[in-house]
């Protein structure tokens, strides 16, 4: 069961960030706090309590009102004390189960989906995006926190800064308030309470304490924003390696819609170039295919995904592919029989995408997730575009005819297999 409330600790003075609230630092086009709240909302958390200091309270209040979040500010008048004290200040605002996280931690969507359904301290045994030397280590015994701290020489996992607790934790903070005069860390609370540990390994999360770490967080968000399920061989091994690096440079400057337009125009230019230079047209076509993944990467990294955006992008891709093959046929083919072959190639190219998109429309599910066999079939758009470029690099009539014949057979064979696998899947009453 997902907790309905979350406490976000944001009382630190952020001295290493130029005295700017770390929760309001923008990473990949969005404030860190916006990311945390938005992703928690998507997973069922409804109410948020932000514990901050007097200086930053007006800034956080304006942020909350601007975005319409159901959140409440609690002021910590003594932010120089440990963050355990900040947690204690929220005790009157939560009851039962609640999530706890830090305002300077950046999490990916898949991390939040797993973590919010965990229990106790969420730990990572395979951290990919943090500096191990600076991270808080955890020793685990009997599935509970045994020891915790940055200087542990022997440890089992890294503290991710995300917790799923209940109000029993405030009995421990009350004891530490009296023992430590309010100056104690969250780590002390977890070690004293011996909270449970849930492992969420190898997913995207990191903390942002310095300007340099913003770059690491940005890279993490872009790299974990790759869709993956519908990618073909060329995308996995070539296109994404390039597009993610470009996305890292653009994610703070360009919107997904702007990138969609740029990619579409480049695709149309590549089609027109078939009338001038086939090798150049092929190269531009492949370049447009590489860049075609950027709008989706930006949308997911910036939390700007929309059904409309995906719909428009899919339509424009069909126009690019249709224009390219039609103009290529016009520029290179003279015999009627090869016009027919080119027509089959064009129809097959359109139907490859239509067959999977129509599945989504009919069953409201991703065809590649529901029918995993489709992932292994050759003929996805990235593979067809790359193949087209290779054929066009050799300017002889036979290579163009071979291209159209290959595309005609490959695409229509793939559509036939897609139809077969879908019918087989749907015919089983428990599959859809």
Curated annotation (Swiss-Prot):
One of its GO terms (biological process) is phospholipid biosynthetic process. Its EC number is 2.7.7.74, 2.7.8.34. InterPro entries: CDP-OH_P_trans, CDP-OH_PTrfase_TM_dom, CDP_ALCOHOL_P_TRANSF_CS, IPC_transferase/DIPP_synth, MobA-like_NTP_Trfase, Nucleotide-diphossugar_trans. It is a multi-pass membrane protein. One of its GO terms (cellular component) is membrane. It is an enzyme of class 2 (transferase). The chain crosses the membrane at residues 264-284, 337-356, 385-405. Keywords: Magnesium, Membrane, Metal-binding, Multifunctional enzyme, Transferase, Transmembrane, Transmembrane helix. The keyword Metal-binding applies. Its cofactor is Mg(2+). This is Bifunctional IPC transferase and DIPP synthase.
